């Protein structure tokens, strides 16, 4: 297993699930950067990064963003939250499987880097 997220999807690696649908999985990050830090991934490994999104495969991205909004409401993030997607080595991406981070639960700094 080369992809840790595929291992989580397959049930080979445990996770604290927060949301699951037919094509999206969300779970608590194992090294949280905020009180609420949830990772959202497509269950299919077809898209490895933001630059792999096309019109043909963008439906799963729309589903991920709908799931992020739903989970943010469920987590009580009414005061605000941040969604992050690292793209490529220089963007800080460490897992070659498209994923988005939902961060919240406290006031986040205004800096992006």
Stretches with model-predicted labels:
Residues 1-113:
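HIT superfamily nucleotide-processing domains
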């Amino acid at each position: 297993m080369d992809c840790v997220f595929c291992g989580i999807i397959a049930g080979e690696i445990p996770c604290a699930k927060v949301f699951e649908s037919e094509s999206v999985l969300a779970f608590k990050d194992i090294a949280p950067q905020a009180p609420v830090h949830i990772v959202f991934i497509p269950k299919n490994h077809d898209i490895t990064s933001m630059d792999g999104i096309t019109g043909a495969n963008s439906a799963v991205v729309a589903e991920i963003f709908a799931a992020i909004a739903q989970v943010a409401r469920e987590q009580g993030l009414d005061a605000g939250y941040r969604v992050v997607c690292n793209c490529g080595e220089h963007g800080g991406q460490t897992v070659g499987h498209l994923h988005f981070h939902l961060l919240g639960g406290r006031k986040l700094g205004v800096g992006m880097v």
